[in-house]
């Protein structure tokens, strides 16, 4: 088994933040959050994915979504994003 696969196998993947055995906030394949840094490209990629997910949820919730004008959609998405 290649090194990458071994580490992935033994660490396991978690998509949500959790506390590791050392009580550190951790995510992914054992990445301690306190040690993480994001460059702008990665942050933008994450933002785009979050916006896609958010727009899908909004579309399922509001029947008028498909017929709304783009500016209305943009305001609704931004408001939902800002409110969390």
PLM features: residue spans?
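Acidic, aromatic-lined catalytic clefts of primarily extracellular/periplasmic carbohydrate-active enzymes
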Residues: 1-83
